[in-house]
Amino acid sequence: MTDWPVYHRIDGPIVMIGFGSIGRGTLPLIERHFAFDRSKLVVIDPSDEARKLAEARGVRFIQQAVTRDNYRELLVPLLTAGPGQGFCVNLSVDTSSLDIMELARENGALYIDTVVEPWLGFYFDPDLKPEARSNYALRETVLAARRNKPGGTTAVSCCGANPGMVSWFVKQALVNLAADLGVTGEEPTTREEWARLAMDLGVKGIHIAERDTQRASFPKPFDVFVNTWSVEGFVSEGLQPAELGWGTFERWMPDNARGHDSGCGAGIYLLQPGANTRVRSWTPTAMAQYGFLVTHNESISIADFLTVRDAAGQAVYRPTCHYAYHPCNDAVLSLHEMFGSGKRQSDWRILDETEIVDGIDELGVLLYGHGKNAYWYGSQLSIEETRRIAPDQNATGLQVSSAVLAGMVWALENPNAGIVEADDLDFRRCLEVQTPYLGPVVGVYTDWTPLAGRPGLFPEDIDTSDPWQFRNVLVRD
């Protein structure tokens, strides 16, 4: 595609925080799809490598870390420079999403991020209990800010591939499933209507089911963590507690599972790191696989969004929802090495598009427990297709950067929506913008269940009355 649409004009400054793998991939999409004054675009990152890359693209660059102490002094002049509404694109680690979001809104600037990120030190603070380090707790801080200051300038929270795009996939998958099950009616337009549809369809749960098969042209070196996206981000979330949205149909809970005393009540966490917690899941390419139950915002937000409550406010329906992530093989080996040694590797490396020889990132949602058993809907984006349609990123990165693009388009078209999550956005508009960057987007039914081939040669603690119980999904051997 050579005739790319220019969606809108951004009249004010564009301030991009972070220029790692996602920032470098997002910048060319901003340049391609928006009209703006190039002199008003600035990138902020503490890395000298990032400075060289930004300057090579002719972009103004500030080599500085955004911290709790300097963020106001640094960002306010940039976001308010000259006429027009500013746009803050926060793609960094170790910067408080909430603080920067509120600062942007105070100054009338639009805002978007891909995660509810805390300030540096939060993830590895030994004084914080597991519950305090959870994504549930981080999300609740954003929800509290929305309650305290409803409406106002739009800020889109958690709008990458996942969290983000997968929330739009869930809605499309529900629409497809309804059609295939012969359930008629108007397409939902409210949260309550979407939740009722999921309940009426009998969806017991949703896996964010992903398989990354991208391979490098060289073997993983010893004591180097290799991944296809931010190693810092993956390690940080991987060492948070495993978390999931907890469905109303579940009859068993792990002994080390804990709930929350406040907030939406949609999630639980386990007293173990997500990147060392395995679950059984399925994607079209790998088919049955083990994935890591890494905590993600969408595990809680989707479960919360699809909750049906009675007149007394009690949840009568909620699907279980969690990530089931099989990263690239080098990252799996890196996790094994990290947990085995009991410490982080001395170095890390993000595989870029020039180092990957082949593979896809197959990322979608697996809706299960309904009348057709299980339905996977998602993107099968290859590295070859990625190179053809977008510069400076691999397949994993493009699924994220194109979701940021879609969220920016939605924010510009809805500039006074207040604080929103990806679940709140118009999924059709967002997928209209994003789909050209996703490769094949497919829906596949499967008769696989977590009880396939079980029990095997050894006795297992399983629930044969309901294959989709979390008791059967969680790998406990």
UniProtKB/Swiss-Prot annotation:
Required cofactor(s): NAD(+)
EC number(s) per entry: 2.5.1.44
Family annotation (InterPro entries): Homospermid_syn-like_C (IPR023181), Sacchrp_dh-like_C (IPR032095), Sacchrp_dh_NADP-bd (IPR005097)
GO molecular function terms noted in the UniProt entry: homospermidine synthase (spermidine-specific) activity; homospermidine synthase activity
UniProt KW keywords: NAD, Transferase
Reaction equations catalysed: 2 putrescine = sym-homospermidine + NH4(+); putrescine + spermidine = sym-homospermidine + propane-1,3-diamine
UniProt cross-references to Gene3D superfamilies, sorted A to Z: homospermidine synthase like, NAD(P)-binding Rossmann-like Domain
Top enzyme class: transferase
Pfam families assigned to the protein according to its UniProt record, in alphabetical order: Sacchrp_dh_C (PF16653), Sacchrp_dh_NADP (PF03435)
Family assignment from sequence similarity: Belongs to the saccharopine dehydrogenase family.
Quaternary context: Homodimer.
Function: Involved in the NAD(+)-dependent synthesis of the polyamine homospermidine from putrescine.
Name of the protein in its database record: Homospermidine synthase
Record organism: Blastochloris viridis
Gene designation: hss
